Every structure is written in structure tokens, then in C-alpha cells.
A protein has these predicted regions:
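Short, basic/aromatic-enriched C-terminal tail that caps enzymatic domains
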Residues: 2, 251-268
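Ferredoxin-reductase
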Residues: 2-93
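Structural signal for conserved beta-strand scaffold positions within catalytic alpha/beta enzyme cores
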Residues: 16, 66, 169-171, 223, ...
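FNR/FR-type flavoprotein reductase catalytic core
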Residues: 83-230
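Local cysteine-cluster metal-coordination motifs and their immediate loop/turn environment
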Residues: 227-259
Length: 268
């Protein structure tokens, strides 16, 4: 039988909700042990507060940024972009947040992989962050390639470095974030035998670079897909995307069949 994770719907208590830079916020909440047991790549459906004058909306899917089972803590890193995240930005210490999760299928680390390369852009870096913690616990080396518009908008660098990861930053403003340069960086890591697998989130262009290298050089990988969702449980089918599975186009639900998928099967 396929593994079915435990899911809870509960009111978590906000511990902190602080700005990281001009665009991103770091939210920490106290929750149950079940919620705090979420794995890298999984997500929660958050019932965000409603800002004044905004229309009602559905729960917001949010990838796990960090967990602590011992302290029963759950962390999210989010960018304030719409009604949902504007509502999250209103939360202060002591407030309650309605959460449902952990949901979906997360990342899997093959015991044979000793060197991982994580490639992310924007909010995708939040999804990859828990991977660095788990990799360190298993004695696996991580090299992270972070992409952003400007250096001041790059997030999670300190977190990755605190877990022993090497971090390479590329940005639009410095003209270093283009696919050609990222491919050059990745080929260098491969030549140095520092890439047993790719892990990625946040950029279709960078996904295609990794797929091309993976296909040519036989390097496996996983991608966390970003998609709008309604239920988050696989019942409403609003998050369906097409995947190329052994030459056949197969429709899958990002929320329940993923959000983590085989790198080579994803269609940008």
C-alpha cells in the first residue's frame, strides 16, 4: 500500500513573523507534533487572515521552510504578492493561524548520493531549504546555486551555509543568472564530481538546463512544482499538470501526486 502521511487541521500559534528583506517574510509558528513532522518538499494549506477590503479566498499552499519536532515549530518563508500573503503579513506573535498538513510527497534522498546540487530561484529557495538540513544529517554534501533579480533579494544563503553547503549566487542585475552561465557552473560541478543528483524549484528556464544535463550525462534529479491549488488534497483537480512519462503525456495532480516529481518527467 502507498504511504499516506498523517494530516492535521489545527490552529497554530504565531511565534514570529519578521521581514527577511524588502520582499520576503519569515513566519515561525508553534504547532502539534504531527504538523512539525512535515518532510522536506511537503507543504501546508494556510487559511490566511483576510485584509480589510479583500474578497474571500481559498487556503494558500505554502512549502515547508523548516521544522523542529522537539520544539514543535513550523516555519514558512513567503513573498508578499497577493491577498493571501498580505493577510499573512498581518500576523503578529500570539495570533492564531489555521493550518492543514503536512501534505503531498516530498524529496527523496538516495543513499548512494553523496553530492547534491540544489538550484533555486525566488520563493523556490524556501522549498529547497529543508533539504540542506536533512542532507547534513545524513552526511551528504550540498552545493546550492541561488538565482534572484538582485543580490539583496537572495534568501536562505545563511541557512544553507550554516548546514555546511557551498553557495553560489547568480543575479539578473549582475547578468550572471542566464541559463548559459548557470549551465557553465553546473558543468563545472559535474566535472569536479560534486553532482550525483539535481534538486530544483522556482524556475522553468533553470529546470530545462538541468533536464538537458541530466539527459545527456545521466544525472537524476527531482523538482518541486509550483502550482495554484484549491483543496490541496487531490479532490478538486484544479492543480493538474502534464508530465512526460516514458514518452507518454500523463496528467497528474501536483498537490497529491507531488509536489515533488522526477526531474526528467516535468514539463516546464
Amino acid at each position: 500500500m502507498p504511504f499516506k502521511p498523517q494530516i492535521v487541521a489545527e490552529l497554530a500559534t504565531i511565534i514570529a513573523n519578521d521581514p527577511v528583506n524588502a520582499e520576503y517574510r519569515h513566519l515561525i509558528a508553534e504547532c502539534s507534533e504531527t504538523a512539525a513532522a512535515g518532510a522536506p518538499g511537503q507543504f501546508f494549506q494556510l487559511l490566511c487572515p483576510q485584509p480589510a477590503g479583500e474578497q474571500p479566498y481559498l487556503r494558500r499552499p505554502m512549502s515547508i521552510y523548516g521544522t523542529s519536532l522537539a520544539d514543535r515549530k513550523l516555519e514558512f518563508l513567503y513573498k508578499v504578492t497577493g491577498a493571501g500573503t498580505r493577510g499573512l503579513d498581518l500576523l503578529r506573535a500570539g495570533d492564531k493561524l489555521d493550518i492543514m498538513g503536512p501534505l503531498g510527497k516530498g524529496f527523496h534522498l538516495d543513499p548512494a548520493w553523496r553530492h547534491l546540487v540544489a538550484v533555486g530561484r525566488g520563493a523556490g529557495l524556501a522549498t529547497l531549504a529543508p533539504l540542506a538540513r536533512v542532507a547534513r544529517q545524513q552526511g551528504v554534501n550540498v552545493t546550492a546555486v541561488f538565482s534572484a533579480r538582485r543580490p539583496d533579494l537572495v534568501v536562505s544563503v545563511d541557512l544553507f551555509r550554516s548546514q555546511g553547503a557551498d553557495v553560489i549566487v547568480v543575479t539578473d542585475s549582475e547578468a550572471t543568472s542566464g541559463p548559459a552561465n548557470v549551465e557553465r557552473i553546473l558543468r563545472g560541478l559535474i566535472a569536479e564530481r560534486r553532482c550525483d543528483a539535481f534538486f530544483t524549484c522556482g524556475s522553468s528556464r533553470l529546470l530545462q538546463v538541468q533536464q538537458r544535463l541530466g539527459h545527456t550525462l545521466g544525472i537524476p534529479g527531482q523538482v518541486a512544482m509550483e502550482q495554484q491549488m484549491a483543496c490541496g488534497l487531490g479532490m478538486c483537480f484544479c492543480c493538474v499538470r502534464d508530465f512526460n512519462v516514458q514518452g507518454q503525456i500523463i496528467s497528474r495532480r501536483v498537490c497529491s501526486d507531488g509536489p515533488v516529481f522526477d526531474l526528467m518527467e516535468a514539463l516546464p
